[in-house]
Amino acid sequence: KKQYGAQGRPQGAQRTPDSRLQPLGDLAVTDPSFDANAMQEKISNLYVQMQNCWTDKNIESLRPYFTDAFFTQMERQLNGLKSRGLTNHVDRIAVLGVNLRGFYKQGGDEHLIVELRTRIVDYTVQDSDKKLVSGDRNREKFMTYEWDMCRAEGSVTTREGAMQSVSCPGCGAPLSINTTAKCPYCGRVVTLDEHDWALCAIKGISQTTR
């Protein structure tokens, strides 16, 4: 089975239609501190960190920035590579553009739809002898993705690094959190998607190899 991992779903997925999206100006009505430039920088940095962690085969540090479901999906695919003795290398990473297209609300969540354009070198080798299994060590891939960032509806942007006082959704205990926290009472890990934007899905829109 093909492992898409950090590169998202198979290429050729359909973009979220513009007709479904509200403009970012509407988001500022309920979240006046939302900063589009800061969000673009955050997403750009997260993309690079995500590729590096994927190559290192350790994504634990990404847990606060993913929803539980997306983290589990990524972890399952990474474990598949480990079990077969393979490493997927993602090198020469560059983020060429981050476009915040708009947002929509569904099921009590807000979804921020983001289009990323990136350049990478993507190849997979056997751990035992470094033999190339797939991809190319030299040819560059120019990728277009759609990222879906989500958070609970009604959440507001907090000052960078600020601690938020929240209640554990598992047992109701009070917690202080800026990225992630483990509840000392019930053991649940509270991540940013419950209080701030977290990555919940990736679509691969297009790919060109040069």
Segments (PLM) and residue ranges:
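Alpha-helical transmembrane anchor segments and their immediate juxtamembrane flanks
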Residues: K1-Q3
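Cys/His-enriched microdomains
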Residues: M163-P169, N178-P184
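Core segments of small alpha/beta cavity-forming domains
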Residues: R9-I93, G170, P184-Y185, V189, ...
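Structured, amphipathic secondary-structure segments that form assembly/contact surfaces
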Residues: V48, E60-A162, I177, T191-R210
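A short, polar/proline- and glycine-enriched secondary-structure boundary/capping micro-motif
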Residues: V125, P169-C171
